[in-house]
């Protein structure tokens, strides 16, 4: 017996709702568990003591430094790469090749990037450093930013470009004042996704920056890292350190979510 279109549509809708609720449900379970266990592990020492004494104060500062340096590198190189692919690469084979490379790099495990930077940078200079760690994170971010830029710029209505050129605007003016202005929401979202992607990475930092259990602002040596400290604390047999790992994960979530919200608010005000 064949099902009519209405029954098929109802079945399909029910399956979509079911799997959608399942996905959201699992996400809510993870977030609620993180909030519950993270709050239980919070204490004044988390924000005042270094990781050597069971706190995360140095790791929080170190993570901010690493993510900031990586974001500068990733945003600068990634944005220019995306603009070049979208607007300056006229050879179709070269353009498709660059897009393919970016897609492959996006799907590459982050630990591979860490091993690559270790082989090129760390082994050459003979020591772990914050610069090496930020390069690894920045390399991951630039792929996200580059893809976002060439896709966002490619989605701008070609008639806007043609009208701008007809008015005598230069290529730089068209890209900066017309195309990027119209693609701004997508570009901002891409940058936020890039920062969120690297904020919780620990695997590449294990090979490039390692970790530091004390306060340090020397980017030429190992910087403390919140994501690596969470990983190390979670493997500890000390229950207090495992609780601190949950608190660190909660703080990392709040940092990423806070950066996202602040960016959205700034964008809405300017809009």
Predicted features and spans:
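C-terminal transmembrane helix and the adjacent membrane-cytosol boundary/short C-terminal tail
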Residues: 6-12, 85, 150-154, 158, ...
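Interhelical loop and adjacent transmembrane-helix boundary motif
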Residues: 54, 205-253
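Periplasmic/extracellular loop-to-transmembrane helix junction in inner-membrane transport proteins
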Residues: 2-14, 18, 34-72, 232-243
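A structural signal for multi-pass alpha-helical bundles of membrane permease subunits
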Residues: 27-39, 117-124
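Membrane-cytosol interface at the C-terminal ends of specific transmembrane alpha-helices
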Residues: 72, 79-92, 96, 129-179, ...
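Alpha-helical transmembrane segments of multi-pass membrane proteins
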Residues: 16, 58-66, 70, 102-106, ...
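Generic hydrophobic transmembrane alpha-helix motif, especially the helices
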Residues: 103-138
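Hydrophobic positions within alpha-helical transmembrane segments of bacterial inner-membrane proteins
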Residues: 25, 63, 67, 71-83, ...
């Amino acid at each position: 017996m064949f099902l009519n279109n209405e029954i098929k549509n109802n079945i399909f809708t029910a399956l979509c709702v079911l799997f959608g609720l399942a996905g959201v449900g699992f996400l809510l379970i993870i977030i609620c568990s993180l909030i519950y266990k993270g709050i239980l592990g919070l204490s004044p020492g988390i924000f005042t003591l270094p990781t050597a004494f069971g706190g995360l104060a140095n790791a929080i500062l170190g993570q901010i430094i690493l993510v900031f340096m990586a974001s500068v590198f990733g945003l600068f190189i990634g944005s220019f790469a995306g603009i070049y692919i979208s607007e300056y690469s006229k050879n179709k084979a070269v353009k498709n090749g660059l897009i393919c490379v970016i897609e492959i790099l996006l799907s590459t495990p982050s630990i591979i990037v860490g091993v690559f930077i270790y082989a090129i940078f760390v082994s050459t200079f003979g020591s772990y450093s914050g610069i090496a760690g930020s390069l690894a994170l920045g390399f991951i971010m630039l792929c996200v930013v580059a893809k976002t830029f060439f896709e966002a710029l490619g989605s701008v209505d070609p008639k806007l470009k043609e009208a701008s050129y007809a008015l005598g605007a230069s290529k730089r003016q068209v890209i900066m004042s017309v195309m990027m202005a119209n693609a701004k929401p997508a570009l901002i979202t891409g940058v936020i996704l890039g920062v969120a992607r690297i904020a919780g990475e620990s695997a590449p930092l294990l090979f490039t920056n390692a970790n530091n259990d004390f306060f340090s602002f020397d980017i030429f040596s190992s910087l403390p890292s919140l994501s690596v400290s969470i990983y190390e604390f979670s493997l500890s047999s000390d229950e207090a350190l495992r609780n601190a790992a949950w608190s660190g994960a909660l703080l990392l979530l709040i940092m990423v979510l806070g950066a996202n919200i602040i960016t959205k608010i700034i964008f809405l005000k300017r809009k």
